[in-house]
């Protein structure tokens, strides 16, 4: 099983992908224990929900982006459809992540 998660390395790359049809963004940090715990789940779900673009953003590396600069806790997940944010939540909950993906299929 391959990893479909795109590790975003620039503000331009994030902006480009946010315009995709269905996007889920994992905003996290390397120092965050819950972020490390949910990461394999996020990768697994990327193979189940193949109609979504799965993005990983390290908030410490992209902190100049307007969206990233507003993140107050990690992990935080944002869900986008055609460039518009449709949902978000914070916390390392597999059940909420899965149900939010299901609701936005």
Curated annotation (Swiss-Prot):
Q: Which Pfam families match?
A: Thioredoxin (PF00085)
Question: Impact of mutating residue 32 to S?
Answer: Loss of activity
Q: Which residues form a coiled coil?
A: none
Query: Keywords, A to Z?
Result: Disulfide bond, Electron transport, Redox-active center, Transport
Q: Does the keyword Transport apply?
A: yes
Q: Name one GO biological process term.
A: cell redox homeostasis
Q: What does this protein do?
A: Participates in various redox reactions through the reversible oxidation of its active center dithiol to a disulfide and catalyzes dithiol-disulfide exchange reactions.
Protein name per the record = Thioredoxin-1
Look up and give the organism this protein is from.
Answer: Dictyostelium discoideum
Which gene is the coding source of this polypeptide chain?
trxA
């Amino acid at each position: 099983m391959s990893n479909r998660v795109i590790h975003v390395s620039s503000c331009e790359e994030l902006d480009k992908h946010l315009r995709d049809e269905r996007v889920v963004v994992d905003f996290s940090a390397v120092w965050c224990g819950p972020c490390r715990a949910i990461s394999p789940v996020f990768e697994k779900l990327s193979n189940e929900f193949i109609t979504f673009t799965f993005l990983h953003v390290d908030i410490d590396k992209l902190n100049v982006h307007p969206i990233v600069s507003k993140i107050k806790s990690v992990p935080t997940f944002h869900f986008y459809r055609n460039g518009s944010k449709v949902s978000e939540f914070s916390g390392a909950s597999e059940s909420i992540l899965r149900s939010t993906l299901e609701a936005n299929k």
